[in-house]
Swiss-Prot record:
This is Phosphoribosylaminoimidazole-succinocarboxamide synthase. One of its GO terms (biological process) is 'de novo' IMP biosynthetic process. Its EC number is 6.3.2.6. Keywords: ATP-binding, Ligase, Nucleotide-binding, Purine biosynthesis. The gene is purC. It catalyses: 5-amino-1-(5-phospho-D-ribosyl)imidazole-4-carboxylate + L-aspartate + ATP = (2S)-2-[5-amino-1-(5-phospho-beta-D-ribosyl)imidazole-4-carboxamido]succinate + ADP + phosphate + 2 H(+). The keyword Kinase does not apply. One of its GO terms (molecular function) is ATP binding. It comes from Magnetococcus marinus (strain ATCC BAA-1437 / JCM 17883 / MC-1).
Amino acid sequence: MQKGEKLYEGKAKVLFATDDPNMLIQYFKDDATAFNGIKKGTIADKGVVNSLISTRIYHILEKVGIPTHLEELLSPREQLVHKVEILPIEVVIRNRVAGSLARRLGIEEGTELARPLVEFYYKNDELDDPMVTIDHAEVFGWAKHREIEEMIEMSLRINDILIGFFANIGIDLIDYKLEYGRLAVSPSTLVLADEISPDGCRLWDMETGEKLDKDRFRRDLGGVEEAYQEVARRMGLEVPGR
């Protein structure tokens, strides 16, 4: 597959065209950002680690029938992915109280929820990604009613799978974000896109409560690189050069 021109560069990834108009190359960067780009830095080998972690997770999800944009891993930090039209909505799944939920409601971080909480956020950096309702998404045309139902159903299935997966390696899945898109070759087909990695998940060690995710960068806790590497190690992934 031939890599073509750069089509888009975001905070953590770059998308390149290929010789197939319906396929893209997704390149994972080492750049780290927080608070919608206000805080910036670099985490050594983050792109490689996130690419490998996300690839492993998406392969697991594909095996149980969750459609994703991933086709294959091309190199440690590059994936071949299906071209999609990303919906301007992030789905956040919460299993415990943390982050903005703790701040908004004044509930102690780490409090276990009676059931997974599904939240929607409008993807807009200028507005700081505000939380929105299902009605907002439908009224403003961000997603169709059927797509919203599919996103909720898929997200809860993904949650069931990932809770068990991470528990088996001693990690609590606290919360995480998901992004979905419409396949370019079949716009009626919704697939999981973007990535699932320590960049977009809160992952706590089950025994110690140690944070193994980007909160270490957000909160200046140190050991960011080591935390990402630890997640990869527990997943049995070999990071080149390590």
